[in-house]
Curated annotation (Swiss-Prot):
GO cellular component: iron-sulfur cluster transfer complex
Organismal lineage: Bacteria, Pseudomonadati, Pseudomonadota, Gammaproteobacteria, Alteromonadales
Biological role: Co-chaperone involved in the maturation of iron-sulfur cluster-containing proteins. Seems to help targeting proteins to be folded toward HscA.
Name of the protein: Co-chaperone protein HscB homolog
Entry's family note: Belongs to the HscB family.
Keyword Chaperone: yes
GO molecular function: ATPase activator activity; protein-folding chaperone binding
UniProt-listed GO biological process terms: [2Fe-2S] cluster assembly; protein complex oligomerization; protein folding
Record keyword Nucleus present: no
Source organism (scientific name): Shewanella baltica (strain OS195)
Superkingdom of origin: Bacteria
Alphabetic keyword roster: Chaperone
Database matches in InterPro entries: DnaJ_domain, HscB, HscB_C_sf, HscB_oligo_C, J_dom_sf
Length: 174
């Protein structure tokens, strides 16, 4: 299913999330099972299925990584359950530096400053990846779609690392 079509958006990485939320509420009202309470069992079942599609579409389009994965899946590149790793040595080196910095936080003289530095480093790198991804996803070239898939893999790693940093920060606050 093409969630961009469902929500009446052109397939683009940058979307208006406020408009997405508005269209989500409109679709929810239109397909909500309560609206079909007095209809046939088949209509009720269709309503439940449509509601699930609307919910999944909303969750997919509101999350930048899932949105990019969906765009790539529409072009025949499936990333959601893959195990392919990033081969970019520069990124792998940066990843190792971030992991070392994460491990060193607890022993740091100023753990909060170390956490803030890592958040800043993540944000800057993620912004670069997102800009590159936006350009690659607008291209019609098959090679650019494969490069976009690599950017998504990197963003997925960044999201995991960000979650780890948040857990470390939460543990220090406890």
């Amino acid at each position: 299913m093409n969630y961009f079509e469902l929500f009446k958006f052109p397939p683009a990485f940058d979307i208006d999330t406020a408009l997405l939320a508005e269209r989500y509420r409109e679709l929810q009202r239109a397909v909500h099972p309560d609206k079909f309470a007095n209809d046939t069992e088949q209509q009720k079942l269709l309503s439940v299925q449509r509601t699930a599609q609307v919910n999944d579409g909303f969750q997919t389009l509101k999350d930048p990584i899932r949105r990019a994965e969906h765009m790539l899946s529409l072009r025949g590149i499936e990333l959601s359950h893959e195990t392919t790793t990033v081969k970019d040595t520069g990124f792998l080196m940066q990843q190792m530096e971030w992991r070392e910095a994460l491990e060193d936080i607890r022993d740091s003289a100023d753990p909060q400053a170390s956490i803030d530095e890592l958040y800043q480093s993540f944000a800057e790198y993620r912004e670069q990846l997102t800009q590159q991804l936006t350009q690659l996803l607008t291209s019609e070239q098959a090679e650019d779609a494969l490069l976009a898939a690599d950017q998504v893999r990197k963003l997925k790693f960044m999201a995991k690392l960000h979650d780890e940093l948040t857990r470390v920060e939460d543990a220090l606050l406890d």
